[in-house]
Amino acid sequence: MENQHLKNHVKAIADDMHNGIEVQVCEHCSTHEEPNPEDTSCPCCGEEMVIEMMDGWQYLQDALDINYLVSSDLKVMQGARILVAFGGPNIWVDTTKGLVEGYWGGDSATASFHEDPMGVEMAASDLYWAARS
């Protein structure tokens, strides 16, 4: 059975992974928000905010879980499986496969991405190596 809501949600996340996510950033106090063309002033300090692409570290801040795929000798982190939604639907971003996988009840949906402009996989790799050291 196909769940259109699940399919749309998975596709939107795959598009975000492929294209990157824009955020408004205050260069004065480092506040980050979703872009709002009607209000570009920082809610914290009032300075003008600029639009930038979210980086991998910012993306992983909202991750619910990260599973790492590593070589048997533990010397190569080959990719990560990142839980980005849980409880209905459950959605994973798999950087090894370039795939977003969603599950909701008995339904499932997948969508692929071929680019990682935010550097999510590199940020996950940095987290893995930091935890191992």
Feature annotation, model-predicted:
Residues 41-48, 56-63:
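Short cysteine/histidine-rich metal-coordination sites, predominantly Zn2+-binding motifs
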Residues 23, 35-39:
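Processing junctions and N-termini across compartments
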Residues 13, 17-20:
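Long, charge-rich alpha-helical interaction segments
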Residues 24-29, 42-45:
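Short cysteine-rich clusters marking metal-coordination/redox-active sites
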